Amino acid sequence: MPRLRVCTACRDARRLFIRRNSVKISIIVPVYKAEKHLAATLDSLIGQTHADLEIICVNDGSPDTSASILEAYAARDERVRVIEQENQGVSVARNTGMAHATGDILMFVDADDTLVDAACARVHEVFATRQPEALTFGLECDPPEVAPASLRRELAPRDAVYDAFAPDLLFKEHARPYACRTALSADFARRERIMFEPGLGLAEDQVFYFAVYPFA
């Protein structure tokens, strides 16, 4: 499966400055057998230009060296929080991360994804100026040539705002709801009791956002 490198539509967003009174973003990272890509993922998160973050890594009983990698990063950067649990699947791991999140905005990054350095700054800017309950942004495959045909037209949705859920959001905007390309208002997630469906390990984010969008 190709690695996904999450990006924002605004290429000059990396010029944004960190605001002293900025809103905290909670980034939830489920970890299982992730030793190959985990360091690159965490490097991309701690290197964000928006520094007011908490990076919640949920080690879902990973049998490889992921735990030691997480321990090293937590010792290096206090924003990295590690939660250990027995293996229960990616949905439960994300729910665990959401339950421990203290930020105003929730983001989901898989342990083989990376963010461009201004991704969180751009997400923060959109939430500050437009106050959405759910935000979908662009992504790209790394390397680009390995992107499956089914994914190519969904990589960069246009800049659009929906005041209420509409089927066009999914079927005309091609804003397919992969977890790694979406941010949520934490207040909205708590109010609507948004969770991933335990037991689902395939297309779990698709089911999750079919529950999210109608309430946003």
PLM features: what roles do these ranges have?
Residues 7-10:
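Cysteine-centered motifs
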Residues 17-216:
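Nucleotide-sugar donor-binding/catalytic module of glycosyltransferases
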